[in-house]
Amino acid sequence: QTFEQAEYTIKTEDWPSVKRVPGTIKRVSWADGKEVIKDVYLENQRAHSGGVIRETWWLDYTLNRASKPNNQAIYYSSGGKAEGYVIYRIAAGTFEIVEWNYLTNTAFKALAGFIGSHSGSVQSFHWINGFAGKDLNDLMPTPAASVKILPYMMARIVELQTFLEKYPFQSGEKETYSLEIEDSYGPWNEGIWTITIDEQGKATVTKGAAEKEGTAALKADIQTWRSEEHT
């Protein structure tokens, strides 16, 4: 499992009271807000668990479907910079947070206040977001959210040689390893590979055994190596 998500359900009476902060929040149409939302997301994705680079067509498909119309609100700092947004919909007494991103703590507080301002018209708030070990309760004065951790995205190594040559190994002494790979979905990855890692942590990868007898020091399928990379 590469990424997990946290699912939050919060009663309106448990949503934290947030003091007013500088800046403004503007409700915008999808057409008017799309580029700003895209820019904030890209700036924030390095700290966003499960964040990926999204094409414009994918944004339109996931966030602007006619069958599930959304609302958009963007937070602008007192200096006029867009620092956060929330995409949401209200249905059946629930404020559904479709996507919530913020670049600063002030933007988080402003948007939390905006969300909370809907307490009089809904019974609960619901949000599913990437999970990186900490949840929304860590940002609240009094933890009140019901949280479920859900499996989300998996990953695999597509081209072993390219992956290893780009991987940032630790610097140190020069070392050479021999790996035998099994990959039923990518036969180009199968075989015995020799990996030499130099003093700067840069790998050189060639197909073929380092040892004369042609046996690999380590043997596993491709998903095992992907799993080890995340441990």
Q: Where do the model's predicted regions map?
A:
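Active-site-proximal cofactor/substrate-binding loop regions of enzyme domains
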Residues: Q1-W15
